């Protein structure tokens, strides 16, 4: 029986409060047999957006993440670094395969947009990382 190699992935956005938090939680909850996910921001807000937490809860995911800086994860090794749409503000992490998903930030919108963003992220995880 072959052992599946668990890939380490870092999701990065500017504030580490919405998109990257959604991606981290979905990866670790639904795809933990394949991925170990982390998230960080180039300018973290200091808190996870409550609408992101509520969106995850609607699909049965309890998320207790915290908004953190990319400085807190420097020196860690990742197989993939995924920019969620932060452009030039996303850091370059040496030795990692870089992807840019360009997912719009839902923070100014309501429940429907957060759910759409969550579902879009889940589809990208399946298509690009598994």
Q: PLM features: residue spans?
A:
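Short polar/charged helix/loop
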Residues: 2-130
């Amino acid at each position: 029986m072959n052992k599946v190699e668990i890939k380490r992935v870092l999701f990065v956005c500017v504030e580490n409060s919405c998109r990257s938090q959604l991606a981290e939680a979905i990866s670790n909850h639904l795809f933990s047999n394949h991925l170990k996910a982390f998230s960080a921001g180039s300018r973290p807000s200091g808190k996870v957006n409550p609408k992101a937490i509520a969106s995850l809860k609607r699909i049965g995911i309890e998320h207790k993440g915290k908004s953190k800086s990319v400085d807190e994860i420097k020196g860690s090794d990742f197989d993939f670094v995924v920019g969620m749409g932060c452009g030039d503000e996303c850091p370059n992490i040496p030795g990692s395969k870089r992807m840019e998903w360009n997912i719009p930030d839902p923070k100014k919108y309501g429940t429907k947009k957060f759910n759409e963003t969550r579902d879009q992220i889940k589809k990208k995880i399946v298509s690009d990382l598994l």
